[in-house]
Structure formats: structure tokens, C-alpha cells
């Protein structure tokens, strides 16, 4: 019997709206779910000991990753309320963008992010450049898709108007 976090990850995939499933089926090469952290999964051993882009830890401590059109989700504990939804958020951000731009690079999301920026609690989401915006996109998607909307309000320092605008964006675009 697989551990509960693996079962939850698979259940999350099954529960996604059809529009998201179609985008992922068209845009991704693979989704890997298994035991351990990222370096233990899908021939990702080369990431063992390598620092994360944030520089705060290494990939060994990480329960999920997205890159090269692959979602990888393991059983390691994670601060993310839902690792699978977070990685799906990154994947959608990538595959739903246009050309070399991710969806979070679009003018529409960029404007939404700028509106939310003064309310963001986490320095991780306020990082300059692409990283903060992409992580906010993935975390916001994860909070909404996993039915943990209060987590989105908390990310935005209790600003419900900004949280509602973010929820509306994801509802219109992805049906969540």
C-alpha cells in the first residue's frame, strides 16, 4: 500500500477539471510520483546536494519539482499544503504560456501580481524577477485547486480583495 501522500497526489490529478487535464496531457511529457525526495525519482540523482534556486536548501529536501515538461512528486514532507497542486501550477504556468513566456509572464498575470505584491507575506513570493512571480502563481494555484483558499488569503496578509481577484483569475482561466 503506498503512503497517504502518494495516494493524495494521484487523487489530485484525478480531481482536476477537464480543461487542466487536457492542457497537461498536451503539454507534458511525463508525471512521476514515487517514494522519497526529488533526487530519488525519475533518474534525478544528479540533483542530490545541489542547491535549490532560492539557495535555502538542496533538492534532497524537496518533495516536488517541475522542469523539462515533467512533474515529479515524492513522498518527502513539504511546507507546501499540496505538492502535486504546486507542481501542476508550475506546469500550467509553463505550458499555458505563449512562445518562450510562461503564463505568469503575461501582462494580465503580471498586473495581478503587482496588485498583490504589497500584501504578500512571504519574501519568497516577493523575490524580484521571474522566481517570485512563478512561485506565487504555483502557490496560489495550489491553494485554490486543493480547496485551501484560506491559505491564499494568508499569503496575501489577509487582503481578501486581492485574494478574490486571484481566485477569479484562476477560475476564469482554469475552471477552479
Describe these PLM feature segments.
Residues 1-176:
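Active-site-flanking segments in enzyme catalytic domains
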Amino acid at each position: 500500500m503506498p503512503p497517504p501522500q502518494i495516494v493524495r497526489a494521484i487523487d489530485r490529478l484525478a480531481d482536476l477539471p477537464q480543461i487542466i487535464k487536457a492542457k497537461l496531457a498536451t503539454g507534458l511529457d511525463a508525471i512521476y510520483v514515487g517514494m522519497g525526495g526529488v533526487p530519488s525519482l525519475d533518474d534525478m540523482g544528479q540533483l542530490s546536494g545541489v542547491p535549490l534556486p532560492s539557495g535555502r536548501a538542496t533538492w534532497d529536501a524537496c518533495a516536488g519539482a517541475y522542469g523539462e515538461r515533467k512533474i515529479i512528486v515524492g513522498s518527502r514532507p513539504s511546507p507546501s499544503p499540496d505538492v502535486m497542486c504546486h507542481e501542476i501550477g508550475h506546469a500550467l504556468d509553463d505550458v499555458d504560456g505563449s512562445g518562450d513566456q510562461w503564463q505568469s509572464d503575461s501582462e494580465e498575470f503580471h498586473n495581478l501580481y503587482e496588485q498583490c505584491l504589497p500584501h504578500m507575506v512571504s519574501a519568497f513570493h516577493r523575490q524580484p524577477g521571474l522566481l517570485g512571480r512563478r512561485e506565487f502563481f504555483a502557490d496560489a494555484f495550489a491553494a485554490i485547486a486543493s480547496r485551501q483558499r484560506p491559505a491564499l488569503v494568508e499569503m496575501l496578509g489577509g487582503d481578501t480583495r486581492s485574494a478574490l481577484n486571484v481566485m477569479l483569475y484562476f477560475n476564469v482561466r482554469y475552471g477552479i
